C-alpha cells in the first residue's frame, strides 16, 4: 500500500492556486494521489515524492513545504520574516509606474510615447506572474481567473487602452493580496492553538530535573509544573494539588481543581500549586494535537454551499467567456456597431465576470467559524455539520451527564427525632459509616455529604454488617442495630411509625425525581435522606436560550422512571419528556423525530448514546476533552463539561449560514448589476475591476465577522 505523507503549505493564497498545486503534485512521477486541504493549508501526498519535488510543484506561487510533524512542534515555520516591500516589490513598482504614467498623461497627453511606455512597464512588471499562469492555461484551454484577466489585458492593449490595462493588473494584484490576507487571518485561529502548549517541559529523570523538548518526552516521564506555568503534555497528577485553567481546551472560564490521579491537558495553565505529572501521551497524540488535526480536517471538508459554488463556477467561467465574445462581436457584425467600443465592453465583461468573490465566499466563512468554535471549546468536524446545525429544528438530550451532572448527591436530610445538633451529627455519621461498607451506587453520595461537612466517619465501628437484597443494609453500632434502606423496608420494620406525614414527605421527594431512603433502628425512625442526580445549574438557561434561537422542540430522553423524568424535565424546561427508554428506544425515537422535524441533533456522552448520536443529523458529545471516543465519534464535541457551549454553537452555525447566503447573493448581484451596464454602454474596465475587487473584499470581510460571534 502506497505511503501517505502530510505536509503543511505556506503561501497558499487562493482556491485556484490550490487546485493547480494539487494537479502539479499529481503529475510527479511516483505520486498516485494528492489532496490539498485549502482551509488548513495542507497537502496529503500518496506515493513517493521528495519535499523538493513537492515544493517545485508549487514554485509558480513560491510555496514553502514543511513536514506536518515538524511544523506542528515549531510554528515558527509559518512566521513570514520577509519585509512588506520585499514581498510586494512588483506591486509597488507597478503602482509607481502607473502614478508617473498618469502624471505624464496630464502633462503630455495620453498619446505621448513616455505615457504609454510607463503604463506598458506597469503591466509587465505587475502582471508577470498573472501572464505566466494565464498563457499556460490559455494554451491548455483551462479557463481560470488568470485566463480571463490575461485575455482582458491583451485585449485592452490591442485597442490601445494601456492605462486601463495597467489598472486591471494592479487592482487584480491587490484583490489577490486581500484574499491571501483574509485566508491567513481565518487560519490564524488554528495556528494560535499551536502556540498554546510549551515546546519544552521540566522533566525529572534519574533524580535530576532538566528542560526537555516535547518531541523527546516519553510516556511515563514525570513533568514538574510550577505555579504560573503552562502544561506541555497530557498526563495525570502523581503529586501535588492545584487549580488549572483549562479555557484553552474546554472553554471553561473557571479554573478546575486538580488532585492526585486527575487528568491534565497540554496547553492548560497551572495557576496555584506545584504539580508532578506523569505523561500519558506522546506530543502528537495530546488532546490539543487531536483538536488541531480534526479542526484542520474539518476546514478541508466541503460544505454543501461550497460544493454548489465550486460546481457553479466550473460552468460559470466558460459561460462568461462566451458572453464576452458575443458582446464584442455581435453588435459590430450584425448592427454596425463600433468595433473598438464593443470589444472594450466585451473585455469589461471578462473582468467583471471573474468569479473571485464567488469562489472565496464560502471557504472564508467556514474556516473562520470552525476556528472560532475551536477557540471556544467546541470541536466541529466539518463545514457540513456547521450547516446542518444551522438548520436544526429539534434537539434531543440524554438526561444523565448532559442535563444533569451524572453524579448522585444528597439533596435533603430530614431529622425525624428531636435531639441536639451533636446527636443529629452522630446519627448521620452512623448512617454514613454503614454506607461505607455498602456496594450501593448511591452510597458514595451519603459518604461525600458527610466528608464535606468534616464529619469523622472513622470514629464509628460497625459490626455484623448485612446487605438486605433489594431493600437496604443493616449493621450494629455500640450494641444497637441500625438500618438504612427504602421506604418498603421500613414499612415492614416499623409499620406503626410510618405515619401519613412521613409518607407525604417521602412522596414529595420522589415526585421531585429524588430517591428517598430512611435511617433508623427496629424501634424508631431517625431520619429521611434524599439523593438525586443533580441538575446542572446551566441546563434551564440553555434550554430557554435554544428556544429563543429558534429550536422548535427540545426533548429529554432517559432510562429513568417516568416520575423522575417528569420532575427533572419540568425543572429544566424541555418541551417533551420521554422516560423508561432502552438504547434501542432512543434510536427509534430519534428516527421518528427526523421524520417529523427533518434536521435533529442528539446530545449525549458519546459512548452510552452512540446509536442515537449516529442516527441524528448531528451527534453532539459532551466532555470531549476527557474522552478520545467522544472526540473521534461525534460530529461535534463540547470539549468542556459545559452545556452552555451548545447555544453558542447553534448561534455561530446560524450566523455562518446567514453570511454564506449573503456572500453568494452579493457576489452574483454585484456582477449582474455590472453586466447590465453593458446595455447603455456604461461598463468600463475601471468599473469592472472595482466591482470584482470590491465584491471580493466585502465578502471576505463579511466572512471574518464570524471571528467575533459570541453567545
Swiss-Prot record:
GO terms for molecular function: ATP binding; ATP hydrolysis activity; metal ion binding; P-type cadmium transporter activity. The active site is at residue 398. CDD domains: HMA (cd00371), P-type_ATPase_Cd-like (cd07545). It is found in: Cell membrane. Keywords: ATP-binding, Cadmium, Cadmium resistance, Cell membrane, Ion transport, Magnesium, Membrane, Metal-binding, Nucleotide-binding, Phosphoprotein, Plasmid, Translocase, Transmembrane, Transmembrane helix, Transport, Transposable element. GO terms for cellular component: plasma membrane. It is a multi-pass membrane protein. It catalyses: Cd(2+)(in) + ATP + H2O = Cd(2+)(out) + ADP + phosphate + H(+). Cd(2+) binds at residues 14, 17. The chain crosses the membrane at residues 89-109, 111-131, 151-171, 317-337, 347-367, 669-689. Coiled coil: none annotated. InterPro entries: ATPase_P-typ_cyto_dom_N (IPR023299), ATPase_P-typ_P_site (IPR018303), ATPase_P-typ_TM_dom_sf (IPR023298), ATPase_P-typ_transduc_dom_A_sf (IPR008250), Cation_Transport_ATPase_IB (IPR051014), HAD-like_sf (IPR036412), HAD_sf (IPR023214), Heavy-metal-associated_CS (IPR017969). The keyword Phosphoprotein applies. Induction: By cadmium. GO terms for biological process: response to cadmium ion. It comes from the Bacteria. Residues 3-66 form the HMA domain. Pfam families: E1-E2_ATPase, HMA, Hydrolase. Couples the hydrolysis of ATP with the export of cadmium. Belongs to the cation transport ATPase (P-type) (TC 3.A.3) family. Type IB subfamily. NCBIfam families: ATPase-IB1_Cu, ATPase-IB2_Cd, ATPase-IB_hvy, ATPase_P-type. This is Probable cadmium-transporting ATPase.
Amino acid at each position: 500500500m502506497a505511503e501517505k505523507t502530510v505536509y503543511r503549505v505556506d503561501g497558499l493564497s487562493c482556491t485556484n492556486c490550490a487546485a493547480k498545486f494539487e494537479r502539479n503534485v499529481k503529475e510527479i512521477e511516483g505520486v498516485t494521489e494528492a489532496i490539498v486541504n485549502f482551509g488548513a493549508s495542507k497537502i496529503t501526498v500518496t506515493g513517493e515524492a521528495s519535499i523538493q519535488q513537492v515544493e517545485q510543484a508549487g514554485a509558480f506561487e513560491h510555496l514553502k513545504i514543511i513536514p506536518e510533524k515538524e511544523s506542528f512542534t515549531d510554528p515558527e515555520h509559518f512566521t513570514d520574516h520577509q519585509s512588506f516591500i520585499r514581498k510586494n516589490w512588483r506591486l509597488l513598482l507597478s503602482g509607481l509606474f502607473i502614478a508617473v504614467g498618469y502624471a505624464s498623461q496630464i502633462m503630455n497627453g495620453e498619446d505621448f510615447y513616455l505615457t504609454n511606455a510607463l503604463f506598458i512597464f506597469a503591466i509587465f512588471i505587475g502582471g508577470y506572474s498573472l501572464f505566466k499562469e494565464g498563457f499556460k492555461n490559455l494554451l491548455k484551454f483551462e479557463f481560470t481567473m488568470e485566463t480571463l484577466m490575461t485575455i482582458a489585458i491583451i485585449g485592452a492593449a490591442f485597442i490601445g487602452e494601456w492605462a486601463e490595462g495597467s489598472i486591471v493588473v494592479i487592482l487584480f494584484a491587490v484583490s489577490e493580496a486581500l484574499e491571501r490576507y483574509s485566508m491567513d487571518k481565518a487560519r490564524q485561529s488554528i495556528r494560535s492553538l499551536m502556540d498554546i502548549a510549551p515546546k519544552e517541559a521540566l522533566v525529572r529523570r534519574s533524580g535530576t530535573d532538566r528542560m526537555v523538548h516535547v518531541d523527546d518526552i516519553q510516556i511515563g516521564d514525570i513533568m514538574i509544573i510550577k505555579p504560573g506555568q503552562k502544561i506541555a503534555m497530557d498526563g495525570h497528577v502523581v503529586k501535588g494539588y492545584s487549580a488549572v485553567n483549562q479555557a484553552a481546551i474546554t472553554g471553561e472560564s473557571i479554573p478546575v481543581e486538580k488532585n492526585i490521579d486527575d487528568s491534565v491537558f497540554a496547553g492548560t495553565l497551572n495557576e496555584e500549586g506545584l504539580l508532578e505529572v506523569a505523561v500519558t501521551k506522546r506530543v502528537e497524540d495530546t488532546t490539543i494535537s487531536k483538536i488541531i488535526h480534526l479542526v484542520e480536517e474539518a476546514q478541508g471538508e466541503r460544505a454543501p454551499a461550497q460544493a454548489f459554488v465550486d460546481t457553479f463556477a466550473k460552468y460559470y467561467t466558460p459561460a462568461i467567456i462566451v458572453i464576452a465574445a458575443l458582446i464584442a462581436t455581435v453588435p459590430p457584425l450584425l448592427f454596425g456597431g463600433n468595433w473598438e467600443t464593443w470589444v472594450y465592453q466585451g473585455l469589461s465583461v471578462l473582468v467583471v465576470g471573474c468569479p473571485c468573490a464567488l469562489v472565496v465566499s464560502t471557504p472564508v466563512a467556514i474556516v473562520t467559524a470552525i476556528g472560532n468554535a475551536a477557540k471556544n471549546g467546541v470541536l466541529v468536524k466539518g463545514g457540513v455539520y456547521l450547516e446542518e446545525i444551522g438548520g436544526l429544528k429539534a434537539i434531543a438530550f440524554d438526561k444523565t451527564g448532559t442535563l444533569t451532572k451524572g453524579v448522585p448527591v444528597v439533596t435533603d436530610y430530614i431529622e425525624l427525632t428531636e435531639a441536639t445538633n451533636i446527636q443529629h451529627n452522630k446519627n448521620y455519621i452512623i448512617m454514613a459509616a454503614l454506607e461505607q461498607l455498602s456496594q450501593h451506587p448511591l452510597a458514595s453520595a451519603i459518604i461525600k455529604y458527610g466528608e464535606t461537612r468534616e464529619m469523622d466517619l472513622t470514629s464509628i465501628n460497625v459490626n455484623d454488617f448485612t446487605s438486605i437484597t433489594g431493600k437496604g443494609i443493616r449493621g450494629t453500632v455500640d450494641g444497637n442495630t441500625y438500618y438504612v434502606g427504602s421506604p418498603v423496608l421500613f414499612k415492614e420494620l416499623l409499620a406503626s411509625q410510618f405515619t401519613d406525614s412521613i409518607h407525604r414527605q417521602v412522596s414529595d421527594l420522589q415526585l421531585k425525581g429524588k430517591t428517598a431512603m430512611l435511617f433508623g433502628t427496629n424501634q424508631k425512625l431517625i431520619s429521611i435522606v434524599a439523593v438525586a442526580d443533580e441538575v446542572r445549574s446551566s441546563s434551564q438557561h440553555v434550554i430557554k436560550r435554544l428556544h429563543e434561537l429558534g429550536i422548535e422542540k427540545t426533548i429529554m430522553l432517559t432510562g429513568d422512571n417516568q416520575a423522575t423524568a417528569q420532575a427533572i424535565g419540568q425543572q429544566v424546561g424541555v418541551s417533551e419528556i420521554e422516560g423508561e427508554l432502552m438504547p434501542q428506544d432512543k434510536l427509534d425515537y430519534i428516527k421518528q423525530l427526523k421524520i417529523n422535524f427533518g434536521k435533529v441533533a442528539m446530545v449525549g456522552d458519546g459512548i452510552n448514546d452512540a446509536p442515537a448520536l449516529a442516527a441524528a443529523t448531528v451527534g453532539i458529545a459532551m466532555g470531549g476533552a476527557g474522552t478520545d471516543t467522544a472526540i473521534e465519534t461525534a460530529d461535534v464535541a463540547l470539549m468542556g463539561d459545559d452545556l452552555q457551549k451548545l447555544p453558542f454553537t447553534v448561534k455561530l452555525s446560524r450566523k455562518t449560514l446567514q453570511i454564506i447566503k449573503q456572500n453568494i447573493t452579493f457576489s452574483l448581484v454585484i456582477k449582474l448589476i455590472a453586466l447590465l451596464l453593458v446595455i447603455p454602454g456604461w461598463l468600463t474596465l475601471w468599473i469592472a475591476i472595482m466591482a470584482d475587487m470590491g465584491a471580493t473584499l466585502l465578502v471576505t470581510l463579511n466572512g471574518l465577522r464570524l471571528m467575533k460571534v459570541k453567545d
